[in-house]
Amino acid sequence: MNDSEFHRLADQLWLTIEERLDDWDGDSDIDCEINGGVLTITFENGSKIIINRQEPLHQVWLATKQGGYHFDMKGDEWICDRSGETFWDLLEQAATQQAGETVSFR
C-alpha cells in the first residue's frame, strides 16, 4: 500500500464513523470531531475515544478506556495487529461501554 492509498482508506474510515455518529439516535450524547487527521469521539460522561493515523506505518491507531490498538489493512478490513479483531468490533465494544448503551457503526 502506498501513502495515497492509505490516506484514501483512512479518509473512508473517518467518513463512515462521522456519518454513523451523525445518524446516532440513542439516548446518550456522542460527539465527533476531526482535527489534523485525529478523530475524537466524546461521550456524555466526558470519556473519549481517539483514532489517529500512523502514516509511516500505514496503520490506524485506536485509543479507548480499555487500551490502545494498532490496525493494519488486511484484505478489505482493518485488523488489530495483536488480537486479530476487526477495527469495527473493537470500536463498537469500546463505544458501547463508554456510552452505556449499544453503539453500532455498521
From Swiss-Prot:
Family according to the record: Belongs to the frataxin family.
Highest taxon, organism lineage: Bacteria
Gene name per UniProt: cyaY
GO molecular function: ferric iron binding; ferrous iron binding
PROSITE patterns: FRATAXIN_1 (PS01344), FRATAXIN_2 (PS50810)
Gene Ontology cellular-component annotations: cytosol
Annotated HAMAP family: CyaY
Keywords, ordered alphabetically: Iron, Metal-binding
UniProt protein name: Iron-sulfur cluster assembly protein CyaY
GO biological process: iron-sulfur cluster assembly
Function per UniProt: Involved in iron-sulfur (Fe-S) cluster assembly. May act as a regulator of Fe-S biogenesis.
